[in-house]
Amino acid sequence: MAKKKIVIGVIGSDCHTVGNKIIHNKLEESGFDVVNIGALSPQIDFINAALETNSDAIIVSSIYGYGELDCQGIREKCNEYGLKDILLYIGGNIGSSNEKWENTEKRFKEMGFDRIYKPGTPIEETIIDLKKDFKI
């Protein structure tokens, strides 16, 4: 079976790169083919990378607190560009620190994300979920 291909990157004006590189390395070590678009990436860069590489999933990372704004409409754009079945994950500091996590998670589910990870979630948890979702 061919390796599953995953686009990763840091959305919006967020420039954290260390965590992005760790995610990249851990995914590769786990047998995934990783397309890393890096930091400071708009939604369309994730979508174009997924289209150009025939990717199976997109993992969006955001630490700077504006992930919700940056991700508005991303599922609709994926659908519009023919990526209706692509897995869409997000993790990092994506909500208000004063808000209950369940509320943040609910909003991102409503935005069309398949999996949502709170700050500090080990990448190994994401890898387990990817394998479940890919049935591998």
UniProtKB/Swiss-Prot annotation:
Positions that bind adenosylcob(III)alamin: S13, D14, C15, H16, T17, S61, S62, I63
Record keywords, A-Z: Cobalamin, Cobalt, Isomerase, Metal-binding
InterPro entries: Acid_CoA_mut_C, Cobalamin-bd, Cobalamin-bd_sf, GlmS
Keyword Lipid metabolism: no
Catalyses which reaction(s): (2S,3S)-3-methyl-L-aspartate = L-glutamate
Residue ranges of every copy of the B12-binding domain listed in the record: 3-136
Pathway terms, separated by semicolons: Amino-acid degradation; L-glutamate degradation via mesaconate pathway; acetate and pyruvate from L-glutamate: step 1/4
Cysteines joined through disulfide linkages: none
Record-annotated membrane-spanning stretches: none
Cofactor: adenosylcob(III)alamin
Any GO molecular function: methylaspartate mutase activity
EC code: 5.4.99.1
Gene3D superfamilies with a match to the protein in the record: Cobalamin-binding domain
Family (UniProt): Belongs to the methylaspartate mutase GlmS subunit family.
Subunit structure as annotated in this protein's UniProt entry: Heterotetramer composed of 2 epsilon subunits (GlmE) and 2 sigma subunits (GlmS). GlmE exists as a homodimer and GlmS as a monomer.
Stated role: Catalyzes the carbon skeleton rearrangement of L-glutamate to L-threo-3-methylaspartate ((2S,3S)-3-methylaspartate).
Name of the protein this chain belongs to: Glutamate mutase sigma subunit
Organism: Fusobacterium nucleatum subsp. nucleatum (strain ATCC 25586 / DSM 15643 / BCRC 10681 / CIP 101130 / JCM 8532 / KCTC 2640 / LMG 13131 / VPI 4355)
Gene this chain is encoded by: glmS
